[in-house]
C-alpha cells in the first residue's frame, strides 16, 4: 500500500510517495489493509476525506489477496466519498522497468535504485518488446506484453495465464522481466526472450501503480475495479467463507474510516 501526492491530474504529472506499507504474509490481507491505510494517513498527516482518488490493483493475482485489496479500496472510497479506480497489477512491473531504464534512477521510489542497472546491458529502445511476468503457481505465469514508445509503453497483449513454454516469441529486441521471468528463464530464452534481472525477486509494488497512474493521468484512469482472476481458484471457496472474508475487509476499512473521523 502506498500513499502519494500527485501534482496534477494530467498525463505525466510528477508525484511523491508519502507513505508505503507492505507485508510478505500472504495469509493476512484482510487483517492488515485497514491498519495499513490508517498508518499511511497518519504518516502523511492527512484524512481519508482529503484524498482525491483511491487506486487498486485488479490482478491478475492470488484470489484472497486480490479480493481483500479491491474490497478494502471500495469500502474506503464509499466511507470517504472518494472515487475508486482500477489498474491491472502487472502494470506496476512494466512501469518499474521502463521508468528505471529511462531515468537511470527510480525517481520518486528511490528505494529501488537497482532498477536502472537491470537494463544496463539491455538497450530498452523505442519499439522494443517487454514481457512482464509474475508467478501464477500451478507451473504457470501471469503475463502481459508491452511495446516501448515515446510516451513510455503501450499494452500489446494480456493479461494472460499459461505455462511459460507456451508464450510466443517476441520481436527484436525483446526482454522478459519480473519474478515469473526468473522462475522460467530457460523456457523463455528458448523462445528468444532476453531475461532481465532474473536473480532478483521483482514483484508488483503499489508505488509503481502510482507511478503508472501519474504517467497516464488521473483523469484518464478506469473506474472498473473488477477483479481479473483469469482462471478458477485452486480450491472452491465456500460462499460463507467468501462472505466472511469480504465482511472482514469491509469492517477493517470502516473501522479505519471511523477512527480518522474521531
Residue ranges and their predicted role:
Residues 1-58, 260:
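N-terminal beta-alpha supersecondary unit
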Residues 2-4, 142-146, 228:
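Conserved hydrophobic/aromatic positions in well-ordered beta-strands
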Residues 12-16, 28, 83-203, 234:
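Surface "functional belts" at beta-alpha junctions
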Residues 24-32, 63, 67, 71, ...:
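Residues at secondary-structure transition points
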Residues 44-49, 77-87, 111, 220:
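Phosphate-handling active-site elements
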Residues 55-89:
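DPxDG-like acidic metal-binding loop motif
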Residues 197-262:
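Acyltransferase
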Amino acid at each position: 500500500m502506498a500513499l502519494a501526492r500527485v501534482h496534477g491530474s494530467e498525463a505525466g504529472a510528477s508525484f511523491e510517495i508519502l507513505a508505503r506499507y507492505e507485508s510478505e504474509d500472504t495469509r493476512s490481507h484482510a487483517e492488515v489493509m485497514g491498519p495499513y491505510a490508517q498508518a499511511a494517513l497518519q504518516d502523511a498527516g492527512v484524512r481519508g476525506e482529503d484524498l482525491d482518488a483511491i487506486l487498486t490493483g485488479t490482478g491478475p493475482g492470488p484470489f484472497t489477496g486480490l479480493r481483500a485489496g479491491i474490497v478494502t479500496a471500495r469500502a474506503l472510497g464509499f466511507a470517504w466519498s472518494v472515487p475508486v479506480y482500477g489498474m491491472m497489477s502487472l502494470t506496476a512491473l512494466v512501469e518499474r522497468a521502463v521508468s528505471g531504464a529511462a531515468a537511470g534512477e527510480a525517481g520518486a521510489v528511490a528505494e529501488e535504485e537497482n532498477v536502472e542497472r537491470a537494463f544496463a546491458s539491455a538497450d530498452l529502445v523505442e519499439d522494443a518488446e517487454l514481457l512482464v511476468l509474475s508467478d501464477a503457481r500451478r507451473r504457470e505465469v501471469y503475463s502481459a506484453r508491452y511495446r516501448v514508445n515515446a510516451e513510455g509503453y503501450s499494452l500489446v497483449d494480456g493479461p494472460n495465464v499459461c505455462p511459460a513454454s507456451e508464450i510466443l516469441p517476441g520481436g527484436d529486441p525483446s526482454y522478459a522481466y519480473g519474478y515469473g521471468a526468473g522462475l522460467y528463464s530457460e523456457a523463455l530464452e528458448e523462445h528468444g526472450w532476453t531475461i532481465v534481472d532474473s536473480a532478483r525477486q521483482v514483484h508488483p509494488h503499489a508505488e509503481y501503480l502510482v507511478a503508472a497512474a501519474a504517467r497516464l493521468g488521473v483523469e484518464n484512469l478506469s473506474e472498473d475495479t473488477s477483479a481479473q482472476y483469469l482462471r478458477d481458484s485452486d480450491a472452491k471457496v465456500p460462499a460463507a467463507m467468501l462472505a466472511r472474508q469480504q465482511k472482514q475487509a469491509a469492517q477493517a476499512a470502516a473501522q479505519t474510516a471511523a477512527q480518522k473521523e474521531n
